[in-house]
Amino acid sequence: MSDQDARWKPDAESWSILEVINHLADEEEADFIVRLDYTLNRRTDPWPPIDPQGWVTERRYNERSLGESLQRFLSSRQQSWRWLRGLENPDWDIVYEAPWGPIRAGDVFAAWVAHDLLHMRQIIEVHWAFLNQNVTPYSTRYAGEW
């Protein structure tokens, strides 16, 4: 997929594939791993603030390179895996008192995985819309129901 294609959006309210990938990279570095670390190791410290929605425009995700963005995400994910593998008998039931209420370390970890899956679905949906817009005069019907 070219950078230009990765910038395509089905509508003004949707994110492009490039925006989703950069969001995942920022979340990998500033959200889940940080908040899981705080929950496991620094429960009395407040979680650092994040602004995932604002970062999309503030950090100009859609102006970035797809290749560099993917590499950044993959590199951050590798660091996260190394950190996770280094945990010794984490207590997944430890509770952090978030502003909205208690959350366990296991909840943060489960949400991290779920967040990935939600955005994988989002990328697939955007790619599907892009394909269907760009195959005209042909059709994807033969592939099956969406």
Protein language model features and the residues they cover:
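Short helix-to-loop capping/linker segments positioned immediately adjacent to catalytic or ligand/cofactor-binding
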Residues: Q4-K9, L66-L70
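A generic short-segment signal for beta-strand/edge and adjacent turn/coil regions
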Residues: Q4-R7, Y38-N41, S76-Q79, L87-E88
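Short, contiguous alpha-helical
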Residues: R7-P52, V95-W146
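Acidic/histidine-rich alpha-helical segments that form the ligand environment
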Residues: Q53-D93, D107-W112
